[in-house]
Amino acid sequence: MFDSLGRTLRRAGYATLAFDYSGHGASGDEIITFDPLIEDFRSASGWLADQGFARQICVGHEFGAAVALRSRPPAAQTYVLVSPVLGPLSYDWNLVFSDVQLSDLEHHGATTVPDDSESVRQQFTISKRTLADMSMVSGEDALRGLSVPVLITHDSFDEETGLLDRTREIFHLLPDGSLVEMTAAPDGIAGEYTPVDGVPVIDEAVDRALAASGSAHLPVLTDVAAEWVSRWVPVSR
């Protein structure tokens, strides 16, 4: 998602930055909780501003959306939030973690999780605090005092996992000019789709989501995002 969106924005004349949070990718082995991630986001934004990029578009995906909003960098002109988690969700951690990992969390307060992404990292570390941060996201706290417009995009899978419902609940808190847009499910997602960790989605629900996306003739994320940023943060020539 970030790669394709980044390519689209660069073609439109924007400079982009992607970075590894603490505990992710090539960064240090920190326990992953929201507070350090928020500081990382602020630091990255501040560094960009120091390089002369004082008009910024902040992009966040799922839990990263809450991190981006709570970071509240001064240079942010707008936010693009893709399938954001903007409210509490119920998780069955038994579907996510092994018995050994659950025992480690119970007795030691932390455990390691294999990183099956394309990252150079082999594993990352989480704690009980991580689970609390993921379970108890507050959309009200994330949006309180926000004054710049926000684009929120959801696809049909978000209806099955409850993410769309969380956005509906906080819609009245969005700043003036904000937009919630439904977009098409990404190509090839049927074979590789995994829901937000711990939120069970049965095969029938995946079929429903794909059918809904295919029949609605929805726009693709990159087109929606490109139109949005050109409106609120036009490229300086």
Q: Predicted segment positions?
A:
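The alpha/beta-hydrolase serine catalytic core
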Residues: 75-235
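The serine-hydrolase catalytic nucleophile loop
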Residues: 1-6, 163-165
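Alpha/beta-hydrolase active-site loop
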Residues: 31-51
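Aromatic pocket-lining residues of Rossmann-like dinucleotide-binding sites
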Residues: 9, 71-72
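Conserved alpha/beta-hydrolase
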Residues: 4-26
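Alpha/beta-hydrolase fold nucleophile elbow
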Residues: 51-62
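Glycine-rich nucleophile elbow surrounding the catalytic serine of serine-hydrolase chemistry
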Residues: 60-70
